[in-house]
């Protein structure tokens, strides 16, 4: 039985992945991981992308146009389909994911942490970034988030888990991308992630490391520019992927996860899965 973790590092453009994440690239060089280019939906806005990642639907259908108007989505999604199939799910993410796929509005006391066997999110550990601004991005330590996901794997026995961190997206908005601060931030993230990724693999998980969207040189995303839309997709697992010159469709991620985990894809997810076995 395939167990899978989806790690989303928010707002990292393709070029920064390929030149600054030395541990990930080292695994690719050794043949222990595969990497492809993936393209975000339009608008390439954070909440719009989150909704598309798990429903397989474009924003023009799920109607999350921007980072406002967050609501419980009415469509089948990765969590709902896995839970129906008897899988145990986990989330260590921004609170938007809980609102989209479990309940809204987010109640910080009720929803900051929950264990609900009936799902759709069996084990949720969330953060809000309340008070976020240019001078203080209010992001939790990524080391702590990776540790929390690892605990869900080892103590709760999750079959599927998602981790989402806004650290690099928030820093990109503040410092832009062609600067020493962002070079170091990507380097630090790569080094922090690596030992956890090794441990997840030792525990029998396939792992995807990717982004929701990119950012351009001025720290912007939402539009059509290649830097705003394109990011890397690293896969640690046994399936094949399409040829390296084929850009992966973000809308295919949800049906690909379900297919890889042996769960039926709902008819609302119309993009063809890209895993080949």
Give the positions of each predicted feature.
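Feature captures the catalytic ectodomains and active-site-proximal regions of enzymes
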Residues: 1-277
